[in-house]
């Protein structure tokens, strides 16, 4: 008889191992699994473990040439999701050797590459990943991190202020540079290329880089503060992207930008390495994230995309506002904000954190709050995000009735007033409106901004609930 039993057998016989003790070097994943009717949860969980590691649909002869015990993913726990019918959290442990060192691309190809189209599952969502130090140590991570950035910019004890230049498409390079100058001159720390500003017929990248650099140096000379503009280096090829970053470095600017999901993790990691080697800060935009993370029961939660970015590398990343026009529930948002900034984050299911994450010495990333925010939100933003954050007001700067520079002044005055009030021990959550009103008495720019946006609200229920 042949020492090999052909045929199709249940995944759970091999891949469901409730007695497994997870190792410190394992990558752990929490999946929200919705099995098809009639598929038992253990089989569904085991199928996820199998299809995202060593398994295939039938027994194969070559299984005998390797050690499944050493290389297979294992579903080691399953729990029903409270309040949902036929939905489970399946916990899967992957041996470290399944992954190429320093490659977020390979990590995702393995863990989420194939299994999401699996027929036995109705839907599947990757809720969280535990990255062991043994793996995170193979990544460079953010080019510089929070402390180094503060030292480069010489700005301490407050959030940083930014503004996305609008209208995002259609301005000529010179007019674009003019808007950059006005915002920086008025008191912002940064201005930003929109995520879809790359190199279009109405404004080629090199012209934009030159005019923005000119704007930056002029504003720096006049204010005595260090200024930055996120020059978007995202391009159609990796070579072109690096070429743009090189030109930014030659201009002597402090920071470039990348769209990490549309650009891809391979390109992003290359750019992050270039930025560390050449002293450039790297601002990351998450364009396309909602395609992946917005559905509650299928896709990948943003906290996983945020962890992946910290490994791939970026110094800033957009992470929702909690108060503006885009998705983000407070506790869950603060959960992944901590995952971006802190060294050690405790498991806390109420904030959507399924695993304790120890980043050891990987630098942190500044969360960027951007999208539909204005001066009245400033106390809440200061309270929610604290000092280590970038607050970005696009329309909330450029929409000021007196123009861009007064819009920037209004935001800077509001921010400084909130920081001062907080440092004096006042309660921003309770007295926020009062603090802004007081400041607007001596700042006509702020008073005008307060008048324009006093009624604006984006009130819809958040989708991202636990």
Swiss-Prot record:
<dbReference type="InterPro" id="IPR017443">
    <property type="entry name" value="RuBisCO_lsu_fd_N"/>
</dbReference>
<dbReference type="InterPro" id="IPR036376">
    <property type="entry name" value="RuBisCO_lsu_C_sf"/>
</dbReference>
<comment type="function">
    <text>RuBisCO catalyzes two reactions: the carboxylation of D-ribulose 1,5-bisphosphate, the primary event in carbon dioxide fixation, as well as the oxidative fragmentation of the pentose substrate in the photorespiration process. Both reactions occur simultaneously and in competition at the same active site.</text>
</comment>
<keyword id="KW-0479">Metal-binding</keyword>
<keyword id="KW-0934">Plastid</keyword>
<keyword id="KW-0120">Carbon dioxide fixation</keyword>
<keyword id="KW-0560">Oxidoreductase</keyword>
<dbReference type="InterPro" id="IPR033966">
    <property type="entry name" value="RuBisCO"/>
</dbReference>
<feature type="binding site">
    <location>
        <position position="195"/>
    </location>
    <ligand>
        <name>Mg(2+)</name>
    </ligand>
</feature>
<feature type="binding site" description="in homodimeric partner">
    <location>
        <position position="114"/>
    </location>
    <ligand>
        <name>substrate</name>
    </ligand>
</feature>
<dbReference type="GO" id="GO:0000287">
    <property type="term" value="F:magnesium ion binding"/>
</dbReference>
<keyword id="KW-1015">Disulfide bond</keyword>
<dbReference type="Pfam" id="PF02788">
    <property type="entry name" value="RuBisCO_large_N"/>
</dbReference>
<feature type="modified residue" description="N6,N6,N6-trimethyllysine">
    <location>
        <position position="5"/>
    </location>
</feature>
<feature type="binding site">
    <location>
        <position position="168"/>
    </location>
    <ligand>
        <name>substrate</name>
    </ligand>
</feature>
<dbReference type="GO" id="GO:0016984">
    <property type="term" value="F:ribulose-bisphosphate carboxylase activity"/>
</dbReference>
<comment type="subunit">
    <text>Heterohexadecamer of 8 large chains and 8 small chains; disulfide-linked. The disulfide link is formed within the large subunit homodimers.</text>
</comment>
<feature type="binding site">
    <location>
        <position position="370"/>
    </location>
    <ligand>
        <name>substrate</name>
    </ligand>
</feature>
<feature type="active site" description="Proton acceptor">
    <location>
        <position position="285"/>
    </location>
</feature>
<dbReference type="InterPro" id="IPR020888">
    <property type="entry name" value="RuBisCO_lsuI"/>
</dbReference>
<keyword id="KW-0456">Lyase</keyword>
<feature type="binding site">
    <location>
        <position position="286"/>
    </location>
    <ligand>
        <name>substrate</name>
    </ligand>
</feature>
<feature type="binding site">
    <location>
        <position position="318"/>
    </location>
    <ligand>
        <name>substrate</name>
    </ligand>
</feature>
<feature type="binding site" description="via carbamate group">
    <location>
        <position position="192"/>
    </location>
    <ligand>
        <name>Mg(2+)</name>
    </ligand>
</feature>
<keyword id="KW-0601">Photorespiration</keyword>
<feature type="binding site">
    <location>
        <position position="164"/>
    </location>
    <ligand>
        <name>substrate</name>
    </ligand>
</feature>
<dbReference type="Pfam" id="PF00016">
    <property type="entry name" value="RuBisCO_large"/>
</dbReference>
<feature type="site" description="Transition state stabilizer">
    <location>
        <position position="325"/>
    </location>
</feature>
<dbReference type="InterPro" id="IPR020878">
    <property type="entry name" value="RuBisCo_large_chain_AS"/>
</dbReference>
<feature type="active site" description="Proton acceptor">
    <location>
        <position position="166"/>
    </location>
</feature>
<comment type="similarity">
    <text>Belongs to the RuBisCO large chain family. Type I subfamily.</text>
</comment>
<keyword id="KW-0113">Calvin cycle</keyword>
<dbReference type="GO" id="GO:0009507">
    <property type="term" value="C:chloroplast"/>
</dbReference>
<feature type="modified residue" description="N6-carboxylysine">
    <location>
        <position position="192"/>
    </location>
</feature>
<dbReference type="GO" id="GO:0009853">
    <property type="term" value="P:photorespiration"/>
</dbReference>
<protein>
    <recommendedName>
        <fullName>Ribulose bisphosphate carboxylase large chain</fullName>
        <ecNumber>4.1.1.39</ecNumber>
    </recommendedName>
</protein>
<keyword id="KW-0488">Methylation</keyword>
<keyword id="KW-0150">Chloroplast</keyword>
<dbReference type="GO" id="GO:0019253">
    <property type="term" value="P:reductive pentose-phosphate cycle"/>
</dbReference>
<keyword id="KW-0503">Monooxygenase</keyword>
<dbReference type="InterPro" id="IPR000685">
    <property type="entry name" value="RuBisCO_lsu_C"/>
</dbReference>
<dbReference type="InterPro" id="IPR036422">
    <property type="entry name" value="RuBisCO_lsu_N_sf"/>
</dbReference>
């Amino acid at each position: 008889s042949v020492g090999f039993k052909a045929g199709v057998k249940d995944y759970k016989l091999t891949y469901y191992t409730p007695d497994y003790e997870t190792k410190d070097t394992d990558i752990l994943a929490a999946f929200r699994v919705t099995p098809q009717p009639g598929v038992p949860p253990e089989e569904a969980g085991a199928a996820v473990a199998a299809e995202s590691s060593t398994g295939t649909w039938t027994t194969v002869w070559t299984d005998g040439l390797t050690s499944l015990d050493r290389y297979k993913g294992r579903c080691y726990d399953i729990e029903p999701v409270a309040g949902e019918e036929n939905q489970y959290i399946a916990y899967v442990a992957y041996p470290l050797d399944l992954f190429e060192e320093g490659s977020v691309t390979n990590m995702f190809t393995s863990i989420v590459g194939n299994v999401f189209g699996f027929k036995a599952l109705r839907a599947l969502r990757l809720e969280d990943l535990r990255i062991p130090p043994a793996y995170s140590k193979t990544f460079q991570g953010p080019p510089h991190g929070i402390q180094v950035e503060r030292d480069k910019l010489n700005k301490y004890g407050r959030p940083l202020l930014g503004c996305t230049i609008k209208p995002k498409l259609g301005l000529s390079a010179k007019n674009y540079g003019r808007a950059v100058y006005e915002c920086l001159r008025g008191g912002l720390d940064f201005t930003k290329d929109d995520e879809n500003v790359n190199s279009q017929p109405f404004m080629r990248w090199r012209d934009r880089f030159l005019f923005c650099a000119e704007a930056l140096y002029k504003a720096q000379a006049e204010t005595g503060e260090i200024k930055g503009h996120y020059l978007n280096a995202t391009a159609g090829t990796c070579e072109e992207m690096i070429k743009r970053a090189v030109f930014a470095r030659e201009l002597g600017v402090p920071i470039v930008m990348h769209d990490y999901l549309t650009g891809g993790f391979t390109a992003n990691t290359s750019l992050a390495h270039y930025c560390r080697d050449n002293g450039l800060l790297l601002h990351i935009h998450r364009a396309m994230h909602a395609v992946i993370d917005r559905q509650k029961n299928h896709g990948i939660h943003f906290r996983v995309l945020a962890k992946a970015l910290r490994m791939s590398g970026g110094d800033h990343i957009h992470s929702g506002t909690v108060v503006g026009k885009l998705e983000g529930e407070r506790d869950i948002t603060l959960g992944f904000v901590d995952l971006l900034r802190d060294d050690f984050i405790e498991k806390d299911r109420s904030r959507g954190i399924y695993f304790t994450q120890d980043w050891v010495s990987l630098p942190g990333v500044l969360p960027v709050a951007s999208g539909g925010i204005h001066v009245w939100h400033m106390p809440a933003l200061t309270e929610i995000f604290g000092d280590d954050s970038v607050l970005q007001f696009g329309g909330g700067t450029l929409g000021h009735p007196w123009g861009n520079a007064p819009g920037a002044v209004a935001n800077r005055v509001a921010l400084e007033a909130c920081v001062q009030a907080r440092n004096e021990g006042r309660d921003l959550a309770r007295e926020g409106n009062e603090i802004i009103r007081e400041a607007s008495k001596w700042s006509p720019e702020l008073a005008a901004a307060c008048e324009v946006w006093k009624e604006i609200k984006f009130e819809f229920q958040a989708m991202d609930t636990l």
